[in-house]
Amino acid sequence: MDTLSERIKWALTKPELPEQRDGKTKSKLRKEMEKAERVWGNNMIGQVDNGNWTTKLGEELVFDILNLKGENPRRPETRSRFKPDWETDNYIYEVKTSNWWVDGTAGEKVLGTWIKYQDIPEIYGKPLIIVCIARQEHELTYGKTKYFGEELSPKTRQILELAKSWGITYVPFSELCKNYNESS
C-alpha cells in the first residue's frame, strides 16, 4: 500500500484545534486527537506503540521524496561519531519532525541543530540540509522564532547566513516536496 500522498498530506496540513463538544473539554479532545495521530503514525511506519514514530515517519518521507527526485538517497556511514539521516550524491540530510499535538518547548532543539552538526559539511564533503516536517515546519514558519518565510528578525537572518556560510541550510518540507505535491 502506497501511503506517500497520505503522509505528505499529514506533514503539510495543520489540524484544526478541537472545540468543546459532547461534554468533553478541549483538553480531553486534544488528547484523543494526539492518540489518534500516534495510532495513525505507527500504522504508517508498520509499528504498534512506538512513541518516537515521528522520527521514522519523517525520515522515510524524506527518503521517498529524494528517491522520487532521483537523488539516490542512502544511509551514510558513521564519521567522527556522526551519522546523519540521509546522504545523496550532492547533500547530507538531517530530518526533524514533530507531531502536530506536541506541547511546550519540545521543538526548540531544532533551532540549534546547525550548531550540533556544524562540522558535517567538512566531514562528509557535502552541504547539510536540515529538513523540518509537520509541526516543526509550522513552528519555524509561524512561531516565535521564525527560520522560514519573509518575517525573519535581523538576528535570525544573521544566524541563518552564518549557517549557510558553513554549508548548512534549513529547508521546510513543503519546499522539498513542492514538485511532487504539485503533480499529485
Regions found by a protein language model. Give the residues of each.
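Residue-level marker for well-ordered alpha-helical positions
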Residues: 56-60, 114, 153-157
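Catalytic cores of nucleic-acid endonucleases
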Residues: 97-151
